[in-house]
């Protein structure tokens, strides 16, 4: 079975909803139902969210970005490695590679992950490419990659339960 054929088809614009509808679809006749099961990992994967026993990897909708983003919640992770084992990307390690939400200054200091920590309602301490800065994610000129800024803003605005109080 040529999974790349199905993945390429699924990655065409406007197919994300179709991919999500297929998630969890079971079929015993693998020869005849591949096209109804393949999500196309390049368009919808999120397997790291499904296999994490602690739900430390969370897929969120980010206004302004085409695809859901996976945020890794450091305080919920026990580094079991499930997400790395099941990641379809070669050498993928979502618990290390995904933007990480930290719950404490100490956790952020003890990690090498790129990520962010809420300082107050408007400001976040952010580490990207080894540089740490405190920014307001409402400001457009933060110096952060736009996808990072928008992801942090989405967590604050739409997923505040992820931020430890």
Regions from the PLM with identified roles:
Residues 29, 35-40, 66-165:
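Iron-sulfur-cluster electron-transfer modules
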Residues 1-76, 121, 128:
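Ferredoxin-type iron-sulfur electron-transfer modules and their immediate structural context
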């Amino acid at each position: 079975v040529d999974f790349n054929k199905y993945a390429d088809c699924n990655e065409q614009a406007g197919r994300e909803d179709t991919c999500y509808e297929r998630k969890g679809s079971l079929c015993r006749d693998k020869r005849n139902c591949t096209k109804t099961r393949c999500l196309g990992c390049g368009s919808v994967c999120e397997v790291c969210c499904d296999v994490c026993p602690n739900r430390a990897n969370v897929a969120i909708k980010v206004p302004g970005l085409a695809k859901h983003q996976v945020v890794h919640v450091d305080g919920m992770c026990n580094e079991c490695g499930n997400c790395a084992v099941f990641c379809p990307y070669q050498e993928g390690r979502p618990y290390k590679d995904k933007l990480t939400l930290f719950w404490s200054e100490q956790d952020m200091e003890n990690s090498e992950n790129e990520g962010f920590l809420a300082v107050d309602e408007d400001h976040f301490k952010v580490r990207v490419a080894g540089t740490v800065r405190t920014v307001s994610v409402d400001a457009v000129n933060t110096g952060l990659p736009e996808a990072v800024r928008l992801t942090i803003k989405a967590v604050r605005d739409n997923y505040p339960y992820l931020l430890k109080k």
